[in-house]
Amino acid sequence: MHLHEYQAKDLLTSYQLPIPPYHVATSLSEAEVAIQAEQWRSGVVKAQVHAGGRGKNGGVIVARSPEDLLAATDRLLHMQFSSNQTAGLSLPVNKVLISPLVEIALEYYIAIVIDRKHRCPVIMLSKSGGIDIEEIAEKQPDLLLKIALPSSGKIYAYQLRHIAKFMEWDKLVADRGNHIIRKLLQCFYDNDASLLEINPLVLTKDGDLIILDAKITIDDNALYRHPQLADWYDPSQENIRDVLAKQLGLSYIALDGTIGCLVNGAGLAMSTLDILKLYGGSAANFLDVGGSASEKQIQEAISLVLSDKNVRVLFIHIFGGIMDCAVVASGLVSAMQGQQGSIPTVIRLEGTNVDKGKEIILRSGIPCEFVASMSEGAELAVKLSR
């Protein structure tokens, strides 16, 4: 689960980390009250969306007067924000963050992420923070320091000395930087984060280290341990089908293809996506209904897949071990009877009650093609999608 910047800062503030004052506004009147209370003569207004690239895409506005702060708030509130990180979506801006300007001497980058290749957390640092960090990481990887961390969450003194030398910090700045790094690690581990990114961490002209922007992602599978964070979930920042899938308890990920998929089991679902690609097609979604889905869940899952206007073909791929093929068939019939028009449907059913399942589908009169193998089904689905 992604946090908004203001939520990330709320969390980091609880760890006594150095963050400039900020206010969140959902309206011009709230912004005006905050600006007057703080007596800010200038500042920055930032759209609160679950996406990077705000600085390059009009989501961050620097203002040099109280009037400009209000004008920036008015401009950003309720805009539809998109960037190369929004996966083609336009995200609504329902809140803005307002904070004072900071006199910056240097910008740094710090991130703690889960390195899945090495199966451990990694801290990454760069002397060149700011809006171009992605380009720097790609074109000048030598400017990015990566240090693997133990699962205990500790960082050792020799590692901190290495960081200070790499970042070219003097002793005073290094002491402050070490404190920040330790607190960031504590926050990362305490809250089961999968990403904690500070960009930029700035050295001010007064010699202070301050966090100007923060991005935090919490592991969805650990949210049951953090109900206070789960309450921060913002469904407005997600694809509506992703939101509905969560409400239905389904494992669903929207993709950009044209073949809608309903599969049971994550391994079979991923294999299905792979074989569709092998035959020259592409899936519109990943959807694992698991082994204990009810007829109602199957019906809603199929309706969810077909709500994507890009879907040209439905590929149902079920291996009924725990899953009952008759339940899948009944859910399919209920879903199709509620649809306007028809869509080409390819079905591979194997396992528990397969004959009964096929009988239910055939008796319903739903136009479909039964196949005997995964490869046959994928080839036919790709052909029908063209």
UniProtKB/Swiss-Prot annotation:
GTP-binding as UniProt keyword: no
Binding-site residues for ATP, renumbered to this chain: K46, G53, R54, G55, V102, E107
Coiled coil: none
Cited SUPFAM superfamilies: Glutathione synthetase ATP-binding domain-like, Succinyl-CoA synthetase domains
Cofactor: Mg(2+)
Cofactor: how bound: Binds 1 Mg(2+) ion per subunit.
Pathway participation: Carbohydrate metabolism; tricarboxylic acid cycle; succinate from succinyl-CoA (ligase route): step 1/1
InterPro entries reported for this sequence: ATP-grasp, ATP-grasp_succ-CoA_synth-type, ATP_grasp_subdomain_1, Succ-CoA_synthase_bsu_CS, SUCC_ACL_C, Succ_CoA_ligase-like_bsu, Succinyl-CoA_synth-like
Catalytic activity: succinate + ATP + CoA = succinyl-CoA + ADP + phosphate; GTP + succinate + CoA = succinyl-CoA + GDP + phosphate
Ligand binding (Mg(2+)): N199, D213
Quaternary structure, from the entry: Heterotetramer of two alpha and two beta subunits.
Protein name listed in UniProt: Succinate--CoA ligase [ADP-forming] subunit beta
Chain's gene name: sucC
